[in-house]
Amino acid sequence: MQPVKMTGKMSFSENVNLSGDCTGDYVTCQASIEDLSIKAINSRKISVKAIVTLKLICESLQDIQMITGVDETENTDIQQLKEELEFVQLAVNQRDNFRIRENVSLPAGKPEIQEIIWDDVDVRNLNTRLADDGLKLAGDLDIFVMYIGNGETGNVQWYETTASFEGSLDISGCNADMIPYVNFQIIGKTVEERPDLDGENRDIAVEVVLDMDVKAYEERKKDVIADIYSPSYDMEIENADTQLRCLVVRNNVSSRVSGNLQLENYADLMQICNCTATVQLDDVTYKEGELVAEGVVSANVFYITSSDSQPLGSVHTIIPFAGTVKIAQISADELEYNIKPSIQQLSATI
């Protein structure tokens, strides 16, 4: 039995109630699939059900007035007590698309491609740094392709490889001394077979489009008036509380997560050909100078079986994990954190 491919798109719309009025705010939406089930209805229809989690973030910019000095006129005796404040200020807030184009070739031992029936492309080890002329990016593309081989038998073949990429985005107003905070998500990808120099379909063209959300913060210092008085006359002073951000820690932490899965109902498993995974954070708590992040790794293993009636199979597993990030002692009410979990390396063995 030869596998076939079916592709399609499902549109959806959803209204989300917000806790406050966000009119005019900068809104970002992060979507992730938590659960996906596909079942056959009949020989021509399938049922697709998914649970999509939406995370909305509303941000606004405010101008904060700080008194840095008082002009003294003649015959005035004004005493000023100044304090140096350290804070970070948003200097760059930009969204742009970054395109990655790579070509890979099948090794000599693989037959040429008749039709690609499945592909999976993921971005790993993405490194970003700010420069005076923009944002520099470098990382790896994990590419997996399953295809029907060209020949009389038309056997199922697969190929997995990693391609490195680098590039840059034009970001106005940035420099190398700023603190970058970059989020990205894949919003489009195409994987196509291409003929090589000999006219055989042995080249694979991959194009990935990343939606880049780039923010850059600038560390600032400012001398402001903490107190003021005059022995010569009474002064009415109006005070107001405000909040300023300062960077406590910016760190990359790696945690090793592993698990075993008993395949009692998958006795025909012959060889693992691909493994994919996503990370889901369930809870983040702060205690005693450290952040504790708890969540799960949702992994899917794609494998070849020895059965002629069902040559392909997959199995899903969930592996819990917990990781810690050391930070300075600070009040929990004053702490604001952003954690971006991602998969750096992934492997599955029998």
Give, region by region, the residue ranges found by the protein language model.
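C-terminal beta-sandwich interaction modules and adjacent acidic
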Residues: 1-350
